[in-house]
A protein has these predicted regions:
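Pyridoxal 5′-phosphate
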Residues: 1-377
Length: 377
């Protein structure tokens, strides 16, 4: 099998799996006062410190959650609610965000009367220059796009914010580009385990100590009174191991994946000359190659490749199965037909040249069959 969908989820690292299994054999609620509880708490706090050190944050700024979607919702709704009480009622969000961000922002507009400004992007997917109105409660712009891989100018956005809290979804960025929470200047940053070799179902929100945030979940207040719920200790420990690993290996993997990605792009262009590469040609993740294939339905092409044991995607797995054009490509100026004719190939720590060979061997026949089937309009 050629697995080319690492942006949806990447295989768990051996060292993360080993420590998960080891920790899962232990007993203890990290909120309990007895010995097993204190042992569990120690593992949680050590993991918090390790993640903080790897990502340029203070341990107290690491709030464990159930994953990227929860972290995005906590940051967007929580900061908005806290700031609305101070008279700020507007949210600025890029038009190419993951649906965990877009839908949370739209929910605030629909249910909380938030004023929303969707920030336009250029043809590569980079946010165009903007100014934040005085009533802005929050700005949210992802660090790296999950579909086309375009990197956003986060330092410039923070400078433009002029004191307005900035949230960034860095789920796709950690381990692929240098990420430093303090140096970036953002107020809140979303990360998750399963996109970097950790378990599914665990993530974190890095939240500045001076950033007000109203809780989404109420209960024990385990995480700085901002997030409640019994902590998943084995997943948290494995998550920390994975974060440390990908940050430590980032430069090596950058070089390796860049070479693989460039080879993939070159060879796809050779066998499908009219394929169109989407996203920024330079400021892009080494893991991502996103193409439009004129005359093809993306879903049909995906299934034809899947029949040959090649796993790819048409975009976010969180929106898979929904027959609609990519909102990312539409925001970049593509027409709906083109936006439905695209595939995302994403690489990760298990990717090899054999995966690219398998894709290139299967792609021409799949494209020919998909074109015979045509594109719905």
């Amino acid at each position: 099998m050629a697995y080319l969908d690492h942006a949806a989820t990447t295989p768990i690292l051996d060292e993360a799996l080993d420590v998960y299994v080891q920790t899962a054999r232990e007993v203890g609620n990290a909120s309990s006062l007895h010995g097993p509880g204190r042992c569990a708490r120690k593992r949680v706090e050590e993991s918090r410190e390790r993640i903080a050190a790897a990502l340029g944050a203070r341990p107290s700024e690491v709030i464990f959650t159930g994953g990227g979607t929860e972290s995005d919702n906590l940051a967007i709704k929580g900061i908005y609610w806290a700031r609305r009480a101070q008279g700020f009622g507007r949210v600025l969000a890029s038009s190419v965000e993951h649906h965990a961000v877009m839908d949370a922002v739209q929910w605030l507009a629909d249910h909380e009367d938030a004023e929303v400004t969707w920030l336009p992007v250029d043809e590569t997917g980079r946010v165009k220059p903007f100014e934040a109105p005085e009533d802005t409660a929050l700005i949210t712009v992802m660090w790296a796009n999950n579909e086309v891989g375009t990197l956003q100018p986060i330092p410039e956005i923070v400078a433009t914010a002029a004191g307005v809290p900035v949230h960034t979804d860095a789920v796709q960025a950690v381990g692929h580009v240098p990420v430093n929470f303090a140096a970036s200047g953002v107020s809140a940053m979303t990360i998750t385990g399963h996109k970097l070799g950790g378990p599914q179902g665990v993530g974190a929100l890095l939240l500045g100590r001076d950033v007000p945030c109203t809780p989404l979940l109420h209960g024990g207040g385990q995480e700085r009174d901002v997030r409640s719920g019994t902590l998943d200790v084995p997943s948290i420990v494995a998550f920390a191991v994975a974060v440390e690993h990908v940050v430590r290996q980032q430069q090596h993997e950058l070089a390796r994946l860049t070479a693989l990605r460039d080879e993939l792009i070159k060879r796809v262009g050779e066998v499908i000359p009219d394929a169109v590469l989407n996203g920024d040609p330079v400021e892009r993740l080494a893991s991502h190659a996103h193409f439009s294939f004129p005359g093809c339905e993306g879903d049909a092409l995906l299934l034809l490749l899947d029949a040959q044991q090649i796993s790819v995607s048409t975009g976010s797995a969180c929106n898979a199965g929904v027959a609609q054009p990519s909102h990312v490509l539409l925001a970049m100026g593509a027409d709906p037909v083109t936006a439905r004719s695209s595939l995302r190939f994403t690489l990760g720590h298990t990717s090899t040249a054999d995966d690219i060979d398998a894709l290139v061997a299967a792609l021409p026949g799949a494209v020919e069959r998909a074109r015979r089937a045509g594109v719905s309009r």
